[in-house]
From Swiss-Prot:
Annotated InterPro entries: DNA_mismatch_repair_MutS, DNA_mismatch_repair_MutS-lik_N, DNA_mismatch_repair_MutS/MSH, DNA_mismatch_repair_MutS_C, DNA_mismatch_repair_MutS_clamp, DNA_mismatch_repair_MutS_core, DNA_mismatch_repair_MutS_N, DNA_mismatch_repair_MutS_sf
Keywords associated with the record: ATP-binding, DNA damage, DNA repair, DNA-binding, Nucleotide-binding
The species this protein was found in: Xanthomonas campestris pv. campestris (strain ATCC 33913 / DSM 3586 / NCPPB 528 / LMG 568 / P 25)
Record-listed ATP binding positions: 643-650
Biological role stated in the UniProt entry: This protein is involved in the repair of mismatches in DNA. It is possible that it carries out the mismatch recognition step. This protein has a weak ATPase activity.
Claim: DNA damage is one of the keywords in the record: yes
Protein's name in the database: DNA mismatch repair protein MutS
Organism superkingdom: Bacteria
A biological process from GO: mismatch repair
Originating gene: mutS
Listed SMART domains: MUTSac, MUTSd
NCBIfam families: mutS1, PRK05399.1
Annotated GO CC locations: cytosol
Length: 891
């Protein structure tokens, strides 16, 4: 296997060293660095040469040190001190370091920033080494391959993804090493590829080192370019067969998926290369079927704010309202479900029935209460498989398995088919639970090296060795009393430190009374320390017992790992069942707490929602939420929604999309009733800003997202369109909005919620009725003026709006009174000159005719406009004089 990167590493300061020592006689030796660098630096360069693009944590005693460019980079990223460590090769050595006992925190920060780190450990014992202690890279930590608890977000999957491409499209493979999942997929377009990456959000992405990759991948954190030959379908197939010890891949359903196979092989090769060990927890590979899930592109996920708001905040999102899971593994499963709503009606009906059964029996409360003592078994089992489990992983697993009889008792009487399946998948693990109960201490230490991991009574030999250590305390007390009595020194003490071992301490003033058989061991400022033959013999015996005790514990620990390894598959199924049960119980809790109802999934096309609410807006608002209905069917496929800004148009559209999504993950929904027919896609075009990274304006982003919708929407798609055409001129925007609405209604024939400020579009409904049917109807949200206040009703009513209340909203936003007054005057002038442009007076065909609307005919002069903009009551004398000069200049 080749190293991670292909280039050969050269010490970064070689060229500088050569230039700075021009008077050196043998410049050839300097150019290679072999003759001038210290032995330690040679060892560093040898380790670094295999990992030139990774930060190298180089173990030196109690610190991991970084040198040269690594030190500079780490100092900048971690805000640690950049210093120097002498010189080597004729130049100072830049150095930065982190303490070994706290390195995981620094490592987590680097991984979160997309960095990869090679850990170079001291292999030999420094006390026994002659010359340099041996060092070796024993571990590579990359953003997509971490499995340590301290480096992971407990409620989010950490994924490694590989992408291959062919003439037919793209192959994707991704693995959750911390959870033991390995999946593949194939997509046929760049848009579909972007949608999958947006759904999965991989921490690290492997791609062939080639040109012409999609623009959205450029500059993305965590992208690793790899040699193209690693993404070969044939070699990938051989690698998968060897890894899983199989003769063919038909059991995984990927025999006819060469592009996905190529990606999977590249991913597996990278994992084996970086982890430097077997991966027994990856026992299969699954093929995702795109047709089984509702499709949502990146824009839709962003607009609906599933787990992250448009501004990047993770609060007040759908996941924030919905997530009532108790365990981290349940939280991760819920996030996966939320980002991949299913179209499989039977699966969803079973989930809904399970939630209902938990509610009706009150079992959800019992399950959630039991789960409060349940840890993250999924990730613990991964660490068991990788033999990196820590002492408290064993105790957490023990306590989790001890809960199983209680959970099984709760589920046994329930009549839900899905809950009974989960009951069976929990399995019976009494023997494993008993093993851990008898073998693991009640409260084990954090680190294995502290000892005390194995319970007393589990192993007789270990108990005997511990007794030697335990009895040592009493021996030392007795020895101290005897020595005080025999020497006559009342202040004599017996103690121990790690450097000098056991000792007898006598103060300087009493040192002359020390018996002749005392041998001086250490001299302090105020005391002398001694050793006796008896104490030396005891020391050898006790220290030997402690070393042997730790060795015995390690042997027993390895035996526990072996025993658990044989039960791994059943335990993984159990953890998976517990995760799903946690999610379903959370759904039940949310349904009761938030007054949600069970949706009805129909095979006939329809979308009927009664008294629907927006789950997030309702949760964060103090006042009651105004519920609204939605009724779409083959003869009523599009609603043109008009009304004032802030009136609730966007909220109404989003809430219906979220209700559909919630129904398709198995949750109850915020409505009194929801009847939902087949849905294959949710597509949205809601709000936008400039995409500066791609050099796209607001209008360009709007048109790109609209184009995607027009090309992909089907009669089973739900489409939300908000204010199409507002990013350009009035006429262009109106023409585009009209064309898009007609295309969606006549060509795509999808379910569409179309919010607009162009009242002219409300005439489309009249044309629909007159022409016999493109299924367009008008609805509106209204507001009422109460004195100087504007009260938004938030109720959706049939028919078009008669006012937009734009000026009133502007006043609410705090526009200067003069600007609002000028706007009112200008509006009156435009309405007088252009006539009433209400849609009821405008023929639908007008949009097809090559004419202007007369909106801005006979423009006023610049001087008139400037004069109308002035508010004399708000001008100072100086401002009034300046305004007069400006007006004169315009004449």
């Amino acid at each position: 296997m080749r190293p991670i990167d292909r280039q050969i590493y050269r010490p970064p300061d070689f060229r500088t060293t050569f230039l700075q020592t021009a008077d050196t006689k043998d410049k050839t030796k300097l150019s290679t660095g072999a003759a001038e660098h210290t032995p330690l630096m040679k060892q560093f360069f040898a380790a670094k040469s295999d990992y030139p693009d990774l930060l190298l944590f180089f173990r030196m005693g109690d610190f991991y040190e970084l040198f040269y460019d690594d030190a500079r980079k780490a100092a900048r990223l971690l805000d640690i001190t950049l210093t120097q460590r002498g010189s080597s090769g004729g130049a100072p050595i830049p150095m930065a370091g982190v303490p070994v006992h706290a390195y995981e925190g620094y490592l987590a920060r680097l991984v979160a920033l997309g960095e990869s780190v090679a850990i170079c450990e001291q292999i030999g014992d420094p006390a026994l080494a002659k010359g340099l202690v041996e060092r070796k890279v024993v571990r590579i930590v990359t953003p997509g391959t971490v499995t340590d608890e301290a480096l992971l977000d407990e409620r989010r999957d950490t994924l490694l993804m590989a992408i291959s491409r062919s003439k037919q499209g793209y192959g994707l493979a991704w693995a959750d090493l911390a959870g033991g999942r390995f999946l593949v997929n194939e997509v046929d377009s760049v848009d579909a590829l972007e949608a999958e990456i947006a759904r999965l959000e991989p921490a690290e992405l492997l791609v062939p080192d080639e040109d012409n990759w999609p623009e959205f991948l450029r500059g993305r954190v965590g992208v690793r370019r790899r040699p193209p030959w690693l993404f070969d379908a044939d070699s990938g197939r051989r690698q998968l067969l060897a890894f899983f010890k199989l003769h063919d891949l038909s059991g995984f359903g990927i025999d006819d998926k060469p592009c996905a196979t190529a990606a999977a092989g590249a991913l597996l090769g990278y994992v084996e290369e970086t982890q430097k060990q077997r991966l027994p927890h990856l026992t299969s590979i699954a093929m995702e079927v795109a047709s089984e899930a509702i499709s949502m592109n990146a824009a839709t996920r962003r607009h609906l704010e599933l787990d992250t708001r448009v501004d990047g905040d993770t609060r007040n999102t759908l996941l924030g309202v919905l997530d009532s899971t108790v365990t981290p593994m349940g939280g991760r499963l819920l996030r996966r479900w939320l980002h991949r709503p299913l179209r499989l009606r039977e699966v969803l009906v079973q989930r809904h029935h399970a939630v209902g059964s938990l509610i009706d029996t009150g079992a959800d409360t019992d399950v959630r209460e039991a789960f409060r003592a349940l840890g993250d078994l999924e990730r613990i089992l991964t660490r068991v498989a990788l033999r990196s489990a820590r002492p408290r992983d064993f105790s957490t697993l023990r306590d989790g398995l001890a809960l199983l009889p209680k959970v099984r008792t709760i589920l046994a009487p329930l009549d839900s088919p899905r809950l009974q399946t989960l009951y069976a998948e929990l399995g019976e693990h009494d023997a494993t639970a008993h093993l851990l109960i008898s073998a693991v201490a009640e409260q084990p230490p954090l680190k294995f090296s502290d000892g005390g991991v194995i319970a007393t009574g589990y192993d007789a030999d270990l108990d005997e060795l511990r007794r030697l250590s335990t009895n040592a305390d009493q021996f030392l007390i007795d020895l101290e009393q005897r020595e005080r009595a025999s020497s006559g020194i009342a202040t004599l003490k017996v103690g121990y430190n790690r450097v000098h071992g056991y000792y007898i301490e006598i103060s300087k003033g009493q040192a002359e009374k020390a018996p002749l058989h005392y041998s001086r061991r250490q001299t302090l400022t105020n005391a002398e320390r001694y050793i006796t033959e008896e104490l030396k013999s005891f020391e050898d015996k006790v220290l030997s017992a402690r070393e042997r005790s730790l060795s015995r514990e390690k042997l027993l620990y390895e035996g526990l790992l072996d025993a658990l390894g044989g039960e791994l598959e059943g335990l993984k199924r159990c953890a998976s069942a517990l995760s799903e049960l946690d999610v379903l119980a959370g759904f039940a809790e949310r349904a009761q707490a938030l007054d949600w109802s069970q949706p009805e999934l129909e095979s006939a096309p329809c979308l009927h929602i009664e008294r629907g609410r927006h789950p997030v807006v309702e949760a964060v608002r103090d006042q009651p939420f105004e519920p609204n209905d939605l009724d779409l069917h083959p003869d009523r496929r599009m609603l043109v929604i008009t009304g004032p800004n802030m009136g609730g148009k966007s909220t109404y559209m989003r809430q219906n999309a979220l209700i559909v999504l919630l129904a398709h993950i198995g949750s109850y929904v915020p409505a009194s009733r929801a009847v939902i027919g087949p849905i294959d896609r949710i597509l949205t075009r809601i709000g936008a800003g400039d995409d500066l990274a791609r050099g796209q304006s607001t209008f360009m982003v709007e048109m790109a997202e609209t184009s995607y919708i027009l090309h992909h929407a089907t009669p089973q798609s739900l489409v939300l369109m908000d204010e199409i055409g507002r990013g350009t001129s009035t006429y262009d925007g109106l023409a585009l909005a009209d064309a898009v609405a007609r295309h969606l209604a006549h060509t795509n024939r999808c379910y569409t919620l179309f919010a607009t400020h162009y009242f002219e579009l409300t005439a489309l409904a009249d044309a629909s009725h007159a022409g016999g049917g493109s299924g367009i109807a008008n609805v509106h949200l209204d507001a009422v003026e109460h004195g100087e206040r504007l009260v938004f009703m938030h109720a959706v009513k049939d028919g078009p709006a008669n006012r937009s209340f734009g000026l009133q909203v502007a006043a609410l936003a705090g526009l200067p009174k003069a600007a609002v007054q000028q706007a009112r005057r200008r509006l009156a002038e435009l309405e007088q000159r252009g006539g009433d442009s209400h849609a009821a007076e405008m023929a639908p065909a007008a949009l097809d005719a090559p004419q202007q609307f007369g909106l801005f005919t006979a423009p006023s002069s610049a001087a008139q406009e400037a004069l109308q903009a002035l508010d004399p009551d708000e001008l100072t004398p100086k401002q009034a004089l300046e305004a007069l000069y400006r007006l004169k200049a315009l004449l």
